């Protein structure tokens, strides 16, 4: 996709989320949303607009989490943001993705494991990455059949912050203060 845009005169910029890949962060990982993504998006948009290679017009696009973060950035109203194109981004993670209908959506189990592969807390530990990849992803069906889970007993235990997120998703059946901060609820 970046090539398509570059061939048409656009600059394509990708920003890593906090605590993923080599971005800043304290290792705390929010699978869905967090309180600072809108602020980070605002700062990035305004930084891009100030670059000599930019005409001052910035647009955002993406699906899933990229849809969520562009909505969060747009809510801050950065002056150089001209357009957003969010695709498949839920406005309330609790209601429309993680616990639709009340029970934990099983796809969230593997999604959190997928995101662990780029989490700062294990990125430099090959054994931990392999434990997550082999145990949590390759054997996901077997793990899901072992429910109920307990902290410290799942392959994600090598990434404590993500394990905490997994168990918050797993145990928190009612919408509460944790879900409110995790969702950054945008439901009208």
Where are these regions (language model features)?
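Cap/lid segment of the alpha/beta-hydrolase catalytic domain
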Residues: 1-49, 105
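Accessory cap/linker subdomain of secreted extracellular hydrolases
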Residues: 1-2, 7, 75-188
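Catalytic nucleophile serine of serine hydrolases
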Residues: 23, 64-65, 88
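The substrate-binding groove and active-site-proximal loops of carbohydrate-active enzymes
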Residues: 26-35, 58, 112-121
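Tryptophan-centric aromatic hotspots in well-structured domains and transmembrane helices
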Residues: 42-47, 51-53, 71-72, 97-98, ...
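Alpha/beta-hydrolase fold nucleophile elbow
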Residues: 52-65
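Short glycine-enriched nucleophile-adjacent loop
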Residues: 65-78
